[in-house]
């Protein structure tokens, strides 16, 4: 194959990279969010209709009225996406359903369109807007319905088998053997009953029939012996039915009729039992005779029923070739046998199965019946007697060594429930609840005047949809830290959630990597911690088929010519098991044949060297194994998988920076991942850019129409980062459909740009980079290299209270004029104001309760309009660490037509923007799991510098590399340096990237030293360091764990109600817990006073802390502490147990523990002091007012006297 190392590849219109890939891409990556969009589209097109057709028609109890489904339609949405965001509304469209009500008595038919509630719509980005917030519905990975067989070992070490028929919804049917070789069944986890009892209940009551169907076997004989109703020829169906009923409903009177009804309802009623399409497909596939008979020896001659010709002789071994001949005959019902159940059985229809006799592998003399279920059509969604009999046959065959047990962790047995199906299931619940209401209304209301509208109550349907989007475990607030986080969230697969696993019950096997994950689920990207292995990510090329199984693409190998064709087949895991697949990097000749006679290939869980004539398929790309985030790690093949996992996860936490920079060393995935993430602004039609500015782009289509694109500016993302788009097209540029018009956050020239390319040296420096710490140059702070913008939202509601409405106002009690300087006349902060912690954002007062006014107060009120009623200041203030610049203010009122919650009259939202430079304590990381905390930011002049005088930007500890085995970072460092010297961007795709030779060759080309190291000089002394140092360009990202969000100090804050100790945590403005061990430390030091005040004043001595406050205010010595509140709580607890507890001092005299309410009246509390201050202020105001009144009175008297004098 021709060497492609170092060819130039174009990514989008604006970026070229030198790619080191040797394998040419045969298949484009699919649209990365199609798992969301396609599934939802299926729901709108087919899923909804399926639902209505399942539940309707609804007949009343007499069969007179019937409500039928005609059609449905989604009308225009009420709000656009942007309006829904702004109004805190849902982005949804009204669903209207046309229903027909038929009265069979009168023959009257009424058709009517009924409103079925607003249905949330998916945005183009694959998200939903619920209450103004973007949410993602995560796809769920669940066990597929079907029939499963497993081996089990009992406590004595005896091997046995078990089997389970799992429906999509309905009762489970389990089979198992015990130590005595007797087979039992359990229905829906109840007590076990002998297998033959269920067969009798189905209508095959006599022993002869049972042996005729299943053939003779030791297990069956033991089971019949155990069966209480054994009788060779008489049918014992009725006894079987009663037996089953007794096990299912112990204690109730057993009759054959009630048992018949119960079994019918459990298994054969489509409303209660549903295998779904996928369940029927899996059952037919598992019970398929073609796979079960493979490599067995026939015990009968098979004859074509139509012509009488012999197809296969008795004694023939059924190899692949023989089975190919036999397959069409089996499909056409070869050896079908019809059994007629007795009239008193559960089933009355005849049962047709296919029975083929083979010799037992364990005893070649004995014949064994292998029974197939006769392939029911996919429309049959319930389990049928033929399925039960065929699965029992499979179960009995397993003991003869025929058939295989299933691996439940294999992806052939696990399927994806995407948005569409999850919504459909939820909608079904709502419709089923509605159905009950409709039936009741049909029987109550007057049939003459009845219309479909009167029958339908949409409340249960609306509620179930609302519940799903609002509170389901799978409906998640979208991770919007950066576009990669957004994309990964939409491609996430969770094994948790309703109908899935729980964290506590999930063992190692479920979480582990399985060979069937290859090309379907990423083996690397999964969270660390309790969810490891339960939350996964879809591989880059994987798709989900109509049954919900994950498929991965392979190139077909033409067996005859040995050529690898460009024909792509998408295979599910269970189908892939039958083939041998070569790796994507197997060398090929010009004509597409393999260049070597032997290639590395996979056959199920084995990695083998296989001769090329046995190969069926070949991988399409080396990156089909991994997920998108993992495929963004260059030199992934040189990293340990644990570190790669951290690298993949940490890229999702990268904070968007002010000036994003795409990596010099990329993998070629940067463009595709940014393009499909939903953060970029994409062109919808071919055309020419006619107008472009920061807020709008207009494209004139080729057909003359004009498309307008709004560019989002500085919107708050779900994660509090800035969501900002920047146009990258220019006036007059020709654009095509799908081109990137504007970069989103963390994007540059259409590529994902999560961090910055910085000059990194691997060296220690005065111990400041001990334990993965990072030393950084002040240049990165000064030039805003790692500066990010954060927008926080604060809101204040004015509600109706019992004492009157709250008011948003500028007039706030006891607040000086300087605190109100940035508030407008309504009391709301102005846009652009710079605010600090504790500043007012929205002035608000709440009524305290109206007291009777005295005569003076009434006079005051009459003169000055002073507020007579007492109000409390409940203004919105900037919380600790929330200072910044007011970016936007939104006001919602009922008058303006905004929908507000009940009891809310006005809602004000204030957005504060912060510009955060990088800081000591911030967390940073590379792409290889090499994370650390910034420990010191040094002046540029003190940083070590290169021989040409360039100071380096970051120093990393070289000890972070060997034990962690993420060597990829060192290769990235060297290649990055070479790329920067050459002025080119490079791409090194995963598992097909630059080899060591490529790296060294590029290093030589760039004119660097052969070891890629350099001498560094100490910035303080100018002396060279002893050894040569690896210096290069590495891509480093700033993570969302910023010290500004974590730093916290308490001054005076809230106390817990019962123990009166300070609360904990930053959110509660709490204190630091001084625990048991910390107390020991102070005891060890003998720091008695410190210890005393920590256990009393600073904790829960309520009286003491108030007196201490008072003493500090008055400048007096601090008094002795009292009894801590937690001690009183203990005493009260013991008293509540009926123990007479008393507290004595050293002199044995009793200390009186008074309740807090009984404290001396002269005890001053903080509240009391505040109230005292308020009263003083009020008195001052009163005094001033009185003086003013007196002055005015004197003025009036003076004026009178003057007037009198003038008259005289």
UniProtKB/Swiss-Prot annotation:
Keywords: DNA-directed RNA polymerase, Nucleotidyltransferase, Transcription, Transferase. CDD domains: RNA_pol_B_RPB2. It catalyses: RNA(n) + a ribonucleoside 5'-triphosphate = RNA(n+1) + diphosphate. GO terms for biological process: DNA-templated transcription. InterPro entries: DNA-dir_RNA_pol_bsu_ext_1_sf, DNA-dir_RNA_pol_bsu_external_1, DNA-dir_RNA_pol_su2, DNA-dir_RNAP_su2_dom, DNA-dir_RNAP_su2_hyb_sf, RNA_pol_bsu_bac, RNA_pol_bsu_CS, RNA_pol_bsu_protrusion. The keyword Transcription applies. The RNAP catalytic core consists of 2 alpha, 1 beta, 1 beta' and 1 omega subunit. When a sigma factor is associated with the core the holoenzyme is formed, which can initiate transcription. PANTHER family: DNA-DIRECTED RNA POLYMERASE I SUBUNIT 2. This is DNA-directed RNA polymerase subunit beta. It comes from Enterococcus faecium (Streptococcus faecium). The gene is rpoB.
